[in-house]
Regions:
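Catalytic phosphate/metal-binding cores of nucleic-acid and nucleotide-processing enzymes, i.e., regions
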Residues: 1-133
Length: 133
């Protein structure tokens, strides 16, 4: 059985993440704020979809819905970092949905990515399918 949830976007890409990490004199404060905001928003999406907590090992399938071809697919996929972090158990000072304990090798069985452009009235974002392994 798999579980699916939607994260409205567009999510920040690799270039935005690097720019935020280099901001504020390279101290990473802007990246930390970006990560905290997006992780918290994604946790809400996970909880709203009622993805079960306490899974041992999962694989994630990402279906990225982009508004245009402005960003390369590999740039867009960088946002998976925020999604994996949101799936983890909450830690001191960090939001987490508790679907898995951590996003390390023992819990992360990998991921698959597909990309498509917005179709009609659809909004940009990402569909995430969590598959227990």
């Amino acid at each position: 059985m798999s579980f699916r949830f939607w994260v409205p976007g567009p999510l920040p890409g690799q270039n935005e993440m690097i720019g935020a990490a280099k901001g504020c004199g390279g101290r990473g404060a802007l990246y930390a704020a970006m990560k905290a905001k997006w992780t918290s928003d994604i946790v809400f999406c996970i909880l709203a979809a009622r993805v079960p907590k306490g899974l041992t090992r999962i694989r994630c399938e990402f279906e990225w819905v982009s508004p245009s071809k402005r960003h390369d697919p590999d740039n867009i996929e960088a946002a998976q970092k925020f999604i994996w972090d949101a799936l983890c158990a909450p830690k001191k000072g960090r939001a987490g949905a508790g679907v898995i304990a951590n996003d390390g090798w023992s819990q992360n069985a990998g991921s698959a990515h597909t990309h498509r452009l917005v179709d009609g009235y659809e909004k940009p974002g990402v569909w995430v399918t969590v598959v227990p392994v």
